[in-house]
Amino acid sequence: MIVIVALYQFTDLPDVTEVHAKLKNLCTDLKMKGVLLLAAEGINGTVAGTREAIDTFLATLKSDQRFAGIAHKESYADEMPFYRLKVRLKKEIVPLRMPEANPSKMVGTYVEPKDWNALISDPDVILVDTRNDYEVKIGAFKNTINPEIDVFVDFPNYVRENLSEFKHKKIVTFCTGGIRCEKATAFMKLEGFEEVYHLKGGILKYIYSIL
């Protein structure tokens, strides 16, 4: 059995070059495959390996206090789903082209899945989907605003052009796995939005927790 782990963590990594080298060597030694992205703002990726390899990888990662509380989700496969290992240095772990929007420094309020339905049932809430247009069309929560963006880097322009009048309203966002809406709320806080919330762990955690 192969264990697949999707993970991310926003945290300041001034030594990101050293962290990159350490994790690349670790994953190589453990014969893991998949993709890890590292930037000064944190880590994001999906990797796969044996149970022993994944346990060793996570234990080593969490031994660094900056990753002690890292969010990760496991799934399983009979065969290795990836062909190779890629551990890459990037400017951002989720591209927004807004490096000052750093969730480890300022971010919206996390909403647990169990509290989500009650929050979005408030008629005064402005519910915004931070996913790309094709994802939104697959399905979304009732009364969701679709920004109709093709890529996440277009989100800031959408907000500035369409949501500025709602800076004093309660803005609630969601995405697939939690990472984009964290970055989105960090940006919106910078823009002066007073009350910004996002679904912790995204739609995936909501489905596992509620349905």
Question: What is each stretch, according to the model?
Answer:
Residues 126-130:
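Short hydrophobic beta-strand that contains or immediately precedes a catalytic carboxylate
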Residues 1-109, 131-211:
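Rhodanese-like catalytic fold shared by cysteine-dependent sulfurtransferases
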Residues 106-125:
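Internal catalytic-core helix/loop-beta-alpha segment
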